[in-house]
Amino acid sequence: MINQRFSILVLLLILLTFSLGFLKEEAKGMEIPSLKEVYKDYFTIGAAVSHLNIYHYENLLKKHFNSLTPENQMKWEVIHPKPYVYDFGPADEIVDFAMKNGMKVRGHTLVWHNQTPGWVYAGTKDEILARLKEHIKEVVGHYKGKVYAWDVVNEALSDNPNEFLRRAPWYDICGEEVIEKAFIWAHEVDPDAKLFYNDYNLEDPIKREKAYKLVKKLKDKGVPIHGIGIQGHWTLAWPTPKMLEDSIKRFAELGVEVQVTEFDISIYYDRNENNNFKVPPEDRLERQAQLYKEAFEILRKYKGIVTGVTFWGVADDYTWLYFWPVRGREDYPLLFDKNHNPKKAFWEIVKF
């Protein structure tokens, strides 16, 4: 009897060992789920890319993303460097890649205080507005039917609690009129494109209310605006997912779409932190993963209001955070590591 029990126990242990080994091997070969498929019933999944890196990221882009944003190639200094001179080549490469692979394209951006040549601001207010109208006609017209959404105006709001619009030539010379006209002219050129106001730190209550006020004024005047873009450049300390939810709820009161347009989560607690990690610390990757998890729980909760989430990059081997705010500092803000493998943050947002 004892021998029989012992034999059964040994057999069970063998079976258990075999099963665990099988499961381990199965897990090794487990298919990595496609982000765009996981979220196909919620919102588009996008990435900011360059014409120089789309083929470097080709496999990741085709599998996981269904929307692309040109990181710099549609900004004024690149696409319209001189009066009456347009260079659509770099942006066209991205748009063509997207079209061939069934992806949408977000246009970024028509009015911004950075990366705009100085000649744009020469002359009178009327001359500047006429120059902008011509720019919008050419750029939006060139991509009509290919770009489904535009960040028409980018970062117009001041970070100073006592100021509304930022101090920049567009607004110092033209005031809020330039914002209104930009949306009106973009809509005239492509009535089917969705038009967004886009800004950073919109999770902050003060800046949130500024954005609410701006968009409400535009809507009250009948200006065509369809959405607000929350950029979403986070650190491990700020903002909180709850702040994101508060902003989504507030903007939803305006009856507009909300998109997270430039999402990334730095592994630093402070934007100017002195550390420079050559290898990301595990505890920081854990914190990053938790923040992504909580953020996406909120984004899914507001399905129908949140219509798109775009990451500002594809994988950790290239991020704008290498250059700003601390030049040369390594960072690891995205869902895929430098070898293009999914990080813990990736698995946290696909498990639901």
UniProtKB/Swiss-Prot annotation:
InterPro entries the record matches: GH10, GH10_dom, Glycoside_hydrolase_SF
Signal sequence segment: 1-23
Protein name: Beta-1,4-xylanase
Class of this enzyme: hydrolase
Family per similarity comment: Belongs to the glycosyl hydrolase 10 (cellulase F) family.
Protein species of origin: Dictyoglomus thermophilum
Keywords: Carbohydrate metabolism, Glycosidase, Hydrolase, Polysaccharide degradation, Secreted, Signal, Xylan degradation
Pathway note: Glycan degradation; xylan degradation
Location in the cell: Secreted
Taxonomy, superkingdom: Bacteria
Record's catalysed reaction(s): Endohydrolysis of (1->4)-beta-D-xylosidic linkages in xylans
PROSITE patterns associated with the record: GH10_2
